[in-house]
From Swiss-Prot:
Domain of life where this protein originates: Eukaryota
Protein name in the entry: Putative F-box protein At4g05475
Domain F-box: 37-84
Residues covered by region (Disordered): 1-26
Endpoints of the signal sequence: none
PANTHER family membership: F-BOX DOMAIN CONTAINING PROTEIN, EXPRESSED, F-BOX_LRR-REPEAT PROTEIN 21-RELATED
Record lineage: Eukaryota, Viridiplantae, Streptophyta, Embryophyta, Tracheophyta
Amino acid sequence: MATSTTLQSLLMKEDEEQRNKRRTTSTMFLKKDDEERINWVDLPPELTTSILLRLSVTDILDNARKLCRAWRRICKDPSMWRKINLRDCLMYEFDFESMCRHIVDLSQGGLLEINIEHFVSDSLLSYIVDRSCNLKSLGISIYEPMTNKGVMNGIEKLPLLETLVIFHSSIKLDLKAIGHACPQLKTLKLNSLGSELAHDISQVGYIPLLECDDDALAIAESMPKLRHLQLMGNGLTNTGLNAILDGCPHLEEHLDVRKCFNINLVGNLEKRCMKRIKELRRPHDSTADYPYSISVSMVVQMMITSRYH
């Protein structure tokens, strides 16, 4: 019922926008009983497509495409499946991996953006990248049973990738290899903290990260086209941050180093960042707007594991 209401609301809104364009300057007062009933099936295909693209993936697959033949035909068009957001799909009861594979098949090789926040297996990632050579934006979370090898094998097949968002636990990624495999990379988000801990770190006590500039140096050496960088909960120091600023000359739009408590953003480094970066998020800035969440226990385990591996 909620899905039908959402669909009807979008349809009515789109139709109203179109009718407003055709109205003359004369004011017309029509009684509700006299208004023409809209035949949604007869809407122009481009208008129907515009409406459908505003729906969630599950709304399209479970409802919209079943309404009529015309809509089913539009829903099968590869252009409907260029940009896919699957972040909120876990609230539904279905075979998530099968649905992802079906969406990739519907795109017919034209998938450009996909965002999957939870539970991607090595085999699913491989299925996506093997059939989406033009992919420009990938957002995934890395939990078991994903493996380092599976993640690296997948990402290294995406030479046109411009945006990479990764949420990982104890997996150590070879960022230098990723940078060389994805030379067009402009946005990197590598986050090591979930919002539950970020909002209230006092729940588990402060667990300092070991100083480690490996990620920072790898980024500096292999990602010269970066414009947006987010490293949350990373162990980099001032040395690593300076290396990034040196190696990424186009990094001017956005730099987010919240929860990177080994950075002391003062003096010349602070001046350098303030002068160059349009949007700077500091280590102690609020994370209230952080949209992703993993459990506190997972983050604590990640921090402990990182100390011994």
